[in-house]
Amino acid sequence: MKKLLPALLLCLPLVTVAEPVRQINNQRDMCQAMLQGVAFNLYLEKTCGFNGGVSRKLAQIGARQCADIFTDREARALSEEAIHKGTMRFEGFGKSQFCSANRQGYNDAGRLADDFLKRKP
């Protein structure tokens, strides 16, 4: 679980305009949060024009920490769920408010991902 702790920290700032953070009890929960974080941050990059490469960085971390946790079908469904929730929030808040509210979390996630990727695998 010590290896999971830094990765868990990455999941916390990912979604500013969101539902409450889900409890993470094990590696599968952490990997689900990571996978959905990748999808949501990719949505932010495409929708808001954020260009910090956070989704790519989180995908690298997920590849290290979460190999073979989900089938391709499960991974696709979880990603689609995160994108759907992002779309609903975007429509509810409007582009300006949605992007503004998620900017700091996106930047924080990028810094945490950079720190995590500097560590040895």
What residue ranges belong to the model's regions?
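Helix-centric, low-specificity signal for extended rod-like, repetitive segments
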Residues: 21, 38-39, 88, 96
